[in-house]
Each structure stands twice: as C-alpha cells, then as structure tokens.
A protein has these predicted regions:
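Active-site neighborhoods and metal-handling regions in enzymes and metal-associated proteins
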Residues: 1-210
C-alpha cells in the first residue's frame, strides 16, 4: 500500500487523479500519527531520529523495529539538472532586483514619509510584482525594526507594528515564488547612524561569516 500524507488543499485535481491512477493512497497530513500507531508488530519503520518530531517517535509501537536512516529521497531531490539550476538563477536575479530597489527606496525615504513594518513589507511586494513571472510570496514576510529584528519568525501586529526611523536596523526576511523557482532572502539594513553598541554587535555577528 503506497501512500502519501499531505494537506489535501495543496493538490490540484490533476495531481490527485494522477496519484490515484498510479495506485498512491492520499492521506491527510495529520493522519500519520494514527497510521504509525497502528503499525503491526514485526514491521519496520524508517525514520531519521535526528529530525523526526518527538510526537511521531513516541507513537511507534514497541513491536515495530525503527531503522534510523536519512530519508533516501533527500539526495535525489537535492540533485538539480541544468534547467533547474538555470531557473533558480533567473528567479534569484529577479528577486535580487526587487530587493535592491526596495533597499534603495527605504534608505531614500526613511524619515521623510511614514513607514512601518507592515507598509514596507507591502512595498517590497509591490516591487516583486513588477518582475515577470512573479506568483506570490513564498512565506509570510518578516520585517523587524530595531529590537523586533531579534525575534525569531516575528510577525508585525497591525495594531502595534513599529514605525521606521532613520536610525537602527531593519531586518528583512522574505521570499517569492516565481514561475522559474522560489527564493528566500534575508538582509539587515542600517537605516541611519548606529550606536556604538549596534556597530559592535553587528560586527560580532558578521565576523564568523567571513
């Protein structure tokens, strides 16, 4: 019984039909726990214990042999053909152009017009929409000004998002889906004169990457 666990909403009718015609059973993503919990004694389950979530590991029955190995599909998925490599390059050139225009716009206009964490995310989206083949964001944009830049996966609340001023840092962690491929680009912009502490910490963070 071959099957996949997936959120059904991400499958088009064509993909669903092709999978079913190939004998692949489509199961709801959350059903994986019950599936593993009901594995028969003496069966085997391969999982990478370094990355599998603890909930899934915990429901494996005592009579099931766990084979601790890296997912064998990882390496083939990582191998890209020439067309894929070229498309990634094109997607990143497009995204780089949009982010560069955004960076210039922010630095020219900060302190002159009203900006906050949400409005600058919308502006970057506007620049991305100018690029041919743009589809949509590849994930929810993260724009963190000042101390908010240190919050992992920060999401600016509409009622209290920070106003940008010509000082401190703006962390921009965003991405895009283009017809050629997807991107994820993170940059930190100095919006004005920095304090001595900000300079010191920025250098300390950058040095290990050299």
């Amino acid at each position: 019984d071959e099957g996949i666990f997936v959120n059904p909403v991400v499958l088009s009718e064509e993909i669903r039909r092709n999978l079913e015609n190939d004998g692949v059973t489509i199961r709801n993503y959350e059903d994986v726990y019950d599936f593993v919990r009901n594995l028969a004694d003496g069966s085997k389950a391969m999982m990478n214990l370094n990355v599998v979530n603890s909930k899934l590991d915990a429901v494996v029955p005592a009579g099931v042999q766990v084979i601790d190995k890296v997912d064998p599909t990882n390496l083939p998925k990582a191998m890209k053909n020439d067309r894929e490599v070229e498309n990634f390059r094109i997607a990143h050139i497009k995204d780089g152009a949009a982010v560069t225009k955004f960076m210039r716009w922010v630095k020219i206009n900060v302190g002159k017009i009203d900006m906050d964490e949400i409005s600058v995310a919308e502006k970057l989206e506007e620049f991305r929409r100018e690029q041919p083949g743009y589809i949509c964001p590849s994930f929810e944009p993260i724009m963190g000004y000042g101390p908010h830049g240190a919050i992992v996966h920060y999401s600016a609340p509409e009622e209290s998002c920070a106003k940008l001023e010509p000082k401190s840092f703006l962390l921009s962690d965003t991405g895009a889906h283009f017809i050629e491929g997807s991107t994820d680009i993170t940059r930190t912009f100095a919006l004005g004169e920095l304090t001595e502490d900000e300079k010191k910490y920025a250098v300390a963070m950058a040095e290990p990457m050299n």
